[in-house]
Amino acid sequence: MVSFFKTPIFILIIFLYLNEKVICSINENQNENDTISQNVNQHENINQNVNDNDNIEQLKSMIGNDELHKNLTILEKLILESLEKDKLKYPLLKQGTEQLIDISKFNKKNITDADDETYIIPTVQSSFHDIVKYEHLIKEQSIEIYNSDISDKIKKKIFIVRTLKTIKLMLIPLNSYKQNNDLKSALEELNNVFTNKEAQKESSPIGDHGTFFRKLLTHVRTIKENEDIENKGETLILGDNKIDVMNSNDFFFTTNSNVKFMENLDDITNQYGLGLINHLGPHLIALGHFTVLKLALKNYKNYFEAKSIKFFSWQKILEFSMSDRFKVLDMMCNHESVYYSEKKRRKTYLKVDRSSTSMECNILEYLLHYFNKYQLEIIKTTQDTDFDLHGMMEHKYIKDYFFSFMCNDPKECIIYHTNQFKKEANEENTFPEQEEPNREISAYNLYLNYYYFMKRYSSYGVKKTLYVHLLNLTGLLNYDTRSYVTSLYLPGYYNAVEMSFTEEKEFSKLFESLIQCIEKCHSDQARQISKDSNLLNDITKCDLCKGAFLYSNMKFDEVPSMLQKFYLYLTKGLKIQKVSSLIKTLDIYQDYSNYLSHDINWYTFLFLFRLTSFKEISKKNVAEAMYLNIKDEDTFNKTVVTNYWYPSPIKKYYTLYVRKHIPNNLVDELEKLMKSGTLEKMKKSLTFLVHVNSFLQLDFFHQLNEPPLGLPRSYPLSLVLEHKFKEWMDSSPAGFYFSNYQNPYVRKDLHDKVLSQKFEPPKMNQWNKVLKSLIECAYDMYFEQRHVKNLYKYHNIYNINNKLMLMRDSIDLYKTHFDDVLFFADIFNMRKYMTATPVYKKVKDRVYHTLHSITGNSVNFYKYGIIYGFKVNKEILKEVVDELYSIYNFNTDIFTDTSFLQTVYLLFRRIEETYRTQRRDDKISVNNVFFMNVVNNYSKLNKEEREIEIHNSMASRYYAKTMFAAFQMLFSTMLSNNVDNLDKAYGLSENIQVATSTSAFLTFAYVYNGSIMDSVTNSLLPPYAKKPITQLKYGKTFVFSNYFMLASKMYDMLNYKNLSLLCEYQAVASANFYSAKKVGQFIGRKFLPITTYFLVMRISWTHAFTTGQHLICAFDPKGCTADCKNSAPCYKSPESFFFTHALAAEASKYLFFYFFTNLYLDAYKSFPGGFGPAIKEQTQHVQEQTYERKPSVHSFNRNFFMELANGFMYAFCFFAISQMYAYFENINFYITSNFRFLDRYYGVFNKYFINYARIKLKEITSDLLIKYEREAYLSMKKYGYLGEVIAARLSPKDKIMNYVHETNDDVMSNLRRYDMENAFKNKMSTYVDDFAFFDDCGKNEQFLNERCDYCPVIEEVEETQLFTTTGDKNTNKTTEIKKQTSTYIDTEKMNEADSADSDDEKDSDTPDDELMISRFH
């Protein structure tokens, strides 16, 4: 009882004790945490101080940087000097000029001493506002005097004056900080430039802003509701008065010669806070610089007083990598984002709410996005030159690579003096000759770069323009202040705005987005525009939209506005509707050839129009609308041409329909749109090398060729090539990659190397070496014929016949251009080309072809094809396709993608007809059928003329088809917006393995990324290209692999390196899979009636399992009532639908046969060439008394029928025990297999699930036996090797001992010494045992390790004495022995002095008794 009461007290004491310990522990932990937090806070304070100092230092690098100030001053002086010496002496000092500008801040210069005309130039004392007015004067007078002769001079002057204005603006905060040493006052002084105007306008040119926009929206609403107006978009832009096409000069400038109007534009933009954009333009460097300064003033307290947000200068931001630039921007704009290395900025940006983002951050987001694109575009373009860069390289390495290429050394040099810079074609070389580039002067020297820009930039070609911009980019990326200053006058940083027009929308549709933005702003808040907006006030999206509208739509004196001029230029001048069509034809860093360069305000117009014309601009901010707009770039452009999943029969008939209904004059119109030399370039794009008649002699006419002496007649060359592909496919599961097929003996040992996991990817250029040996062998056998030898080798080749000369030329051309030769094929249908063929035979052939195709497909319908070889001249072809692609982009209102392709095809047909001058007109001519249409004196021509004759002969029939195949590959690739992403996808590490896989077509990544096999057959190539790779029995896989190689070359031309490698790796594997798939598909569809019968039976049994009664009484087995539907349920067993034991006995029989067919089919896993050939290797010494089997191809051979039987056994076994699985396979048979898209994905599913189950089943059945056979085979082989080695060691001794002991005394071998030596020496030379050594030998087995290094001679003597030959004078000694002795004589050191006349005796037939080997008793 006492203990009962003590228990709660004891528990209470324990609880209090533990509680105290816990509290103490918590307090200790708290103290520790406080200490840690104090340490952390100390570190944070230190970091904060560093960050604070960093912020201030970053701002000082922009407005307190002495180096920047020095370089800007230097460039300012250079510009002022160049303006004074400029050949264009404008602007002139006219009456009224002094009222426009303060003439005291300008210098006046006379044009000539004899002329009273005076022009003015700015000075160092000229302010920013003075340069603004000076720019207005230059534009006014340039418009008045403009002509094509001075076009480049006007452009250059406008560029440098704009640069001078930018420099004056950049120097304002620099000079202010230098004088006052106050950061904020320097920023405010810059801000006052756009707020404190010298003369405040009393009234706006548009009156009250609110009233103006209300009237505008009412007018827009009226037009949209008016059903009589057809083109509402054009009416919104041009108004009621239709404007005709203006003079071409009117398109060069945004305004006409009216300075007052220019000033009104400046005032409008200042009122809406867009003055900075108006005066600077969309220059990526300058606009970014001032936008960052604007952000610094706006958030000065957070950046530099509260010091809570990180700040970076614009120059520093550009030094970061492309992805880090956005991270830095988010830090400056106080945004929190989650970054994924593999995700695009667009995706991460849109995941975070950016509704409160300031306009400055939006503009910086835009500038960074397109600066990154500008950087990538320049780097991508270098791939067209002799050196390659990639976007992910470190900036230092980009610089080193550039100078290593230009200067042959990573050290800087003056690139304008290097050979790389000078060697661009079609340019006058006026540079001084230097052996070594000058390295004493920096490559970024301000004077040097400005001098060459002013002197020669207008004459630069594409490559030199690229080098100049790339030089500047390397400096920017590596924080070089001189490059930062030099960039201010480079055109590429203005032109980058063109890259933002990517959507395929009409210009009027983009303008409607701007109107929607204004409508949204007007509906949300009806307020008066603040007239004193400045840099400190927020520039809202509404300010941007309304300001952009007024800037682009203001006009005077009924002169068209900027918007109207640009729209007329597109629709009336160029006759296009989409801005993207124009932009795609322009270079991003071009020279002065672009008309926009006449007036930089064109770029300002495009920039403002771009910011306000995104589709979602009315609902989102600028950056969000931009990223939502480019979201379509990730969407696959699915058209009939580009969509590889589009049903091929529909695509084929649609293509033929479009071709048939193309207007006759459309081809003529296309020719007019092309340049004058393009047709000749088209002819030179292809060169035919291997004549079709040459290949036919080894293929179709192979039976006429004489076989080599003692050898059987050779098989057709296409059959041999096809067999090689089939053989590789059969052997690939065991790891016999074809790159080792050069040596047939190595191939037998490759299976052992598979275990070492040394992967050798199947690259086509290695496989081509194997095919080359086969092709050369076939030609060599042809030239070894007796009649060919007599004609070709033993007679003058001048009188040789044309056919033999054509054969020799074809093989010589093939060997010379082996790496570039591609083989195409066409159907060989003689009856189709011969007019003498009766009509009923043609109808019969057509009916047979139809029946053959309907019940399956047209696989193997023809044995032979017309195969020919050619090469592509990639540089010329690329120029042709680029021009045609530009024509298509400019004329999308005339052409669709399909109609343009077919128009080009008809143009190629027209070119093909120009080659038909030497062809007979009658189609019955045998020469026309077999393409022997070379000139009659072909063999008498020289080599160059014969090569031209081969090309003309082949081009007369196959130019159009071959050229169009190459063109469509390039055109459809350029048309698709999916190729960039696809190329990046196959550059990832996980997909590189897919590209090199021998079964890539059964992987999800391969199918998901477009299945390059289906892309080649259904998108990249025209429909007629599928005929030879399906209908030919011999050569279809060979031709398909060449399609892959053509695709590889085309992708390489477009700089898609990963896709190029993918096609090269898959040229054999995917081509084999396609051929095997077609054969299986053909026979599979023949079983439609049988499959349907069993499906109906299965449905009836399913009904019986679920209801107990059969649906169809005919399938009710005997024993049940005749009236099955009215009988009592006797089959009801729902679980039998999933698994049934009733048919287990029958299923086991089929499982048994399935097991043994697997043994035959899977033998390749362990035995190269199969189990049979492996066994035959042990009997190679026995001559095989049988005929040589015909090489196998992808057709209905023994293996195919074994696989068919294997499939039947599998179906009968597993379909019987599981109806659910049977229905699954029925769905595949009836639906999935008939739709290519579903079939490809089912193949992947089948590999990972169904085939996985089959593999596991094989592992416990047939694979066990195959492995046992392999081990037994190797054991027998090793035992055989052991026996051979033992026999090889004993054989020489046994044979000599047998000779000594068994030879009859009466029968003496009358052999001379050298006969004996030669006999035994030859015997010993054939014995090679690799110096194997036997371990653990007993005393009686030691002889196994003895080797005979010399020819043995055995002498048998009596036990008492050994006698020598009577003629041996030097040997008189005797040796006593007790038993038979073996003596080894070194025949090489034998004393030849004893037989001086032996050499003469070798030719004698009489025996030499003195040299006989005799026995003595």
Swiss-Prot record:
The chain crosses the membrane at residues 1204-1224. It comes from the Eukaryota. GO terms for biological process: adhesion of symbiont to microvasculature. Residues 1394-1411 have a biased composition (Acidic residues). One of its GO terms (cellular component) is membrane. Disulfide bonds join C333-C361, C407-C413, C517-C545, C521-C542. Residues 1-24 form the signal peptide. Residues 1383-1417 are annotated as: Disordered. The keyword Membrane applies. PANTHER family: 32 KDA HEAT SHOCK PROTEIN-RELATED, CHROMOSOME UNDETERMINED SCAFFOLD_55, WHOLE GENOME SHOTGUN SEQUENCE. Many Plasmodium falciparum strains have two highly similar paralogous genes, CLAG3.1 and CLAG3.2, that are mutually exclusively expressed. CLAG3.1 is preferentially expressed in cultured parasites. Analysis of blood specimens from 20 Plasmodium falciparum-infected symptomatic patients indicates that parasites predominantly express CLAG3.2 in natural malaria infections. CLAG3.1/CLAG3.2 expression patterns can change under different environment conditions. In Dd2 strain, CLAG3.1 activity is inhibited by ISPA-28 compound. Participates in the formation of new permeability pathways in Plasmodium-infected erythrocytes enabling the uptake of nutrients from the blood plasma. This is Cytoadherence-linked asexual protein 3.1. It comes from Plasmodium falciparum.
